[in-house]
Regions:
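Alpha-helical membrane insertion/targeting regions
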Residues: 1-161
């Protein structure tokens, strides 16, 4: 399967965004827009989600487009929660939104990688292939656990102050 220029931009930025997100979460605990890594993640994520909305090779509007919209909504929610303290839970919303957006990146990425690799015998030929479903569940559990850990540390920090 050949990849278009917009597909390459989408793939490269999306991959870099995921790598940067993992780096941020593992070194700083949370993604935020106040440092350069966080800014890069947010900008790359919005560009990746926006370019996803321009791709229709797989038969029109589909799950990947819905996830792109959810990604943009999550980023907007994360940015908004950084700027405004909503009922004292803005930090929790920020953590959930930004970290959740990583999952929205991963789901279509998993399907695309498994559709293409290995080249001679791809693992998952459709979005709903059992191999892909297993990966979705694994990464949903990892991201969900990460969000719960982030919330725990926010709660602990808040209760100590």
């Amino acid at each position: 399967m050949e990849i278009s220029l917009i597909g390459w931009i989408h793939t490269i930025l999306g991959t870099l965004a995921i790598i940067v997100a993992v780096f941020i979460i593992s070194t700083q605990g949370f993604i935020n827009s106040k440092n350069n890594f966080g800014k890069f993640y947010i900008i790359a994520t919005v560009i990746t989600a926006s370019t996803a909305l321009l791709m229709y090779k797989n038969g029109g509007f589909n799950l990947a487009h819905i996830l792109a919209i959810l990604t943009i909504v999550a980023i907007i929610l994360g940015i908004t929660s950084e700027k405004y303290n909503i009922l004292g839970i803005s930090k929790y919303i920020q953590a959930m939104s930004y970290t959740g957006s990583v999952l929205f990146h991963l789901i279509p990425g998993i399907a695309e990688v498994n559709k293409r690799l290995p080249i001679d015998n791809p693992m998952g030929l459709s979005v709903l292939d059992p191999v892909n479903i297993r990966y979705y569940l694994i990464f949903t559990a990892i991201i969900g656990t990460t969000i719960l850990i982030q919330w725990y540390f926010l709660w602990k920090k808040r209760s100590m102050s």
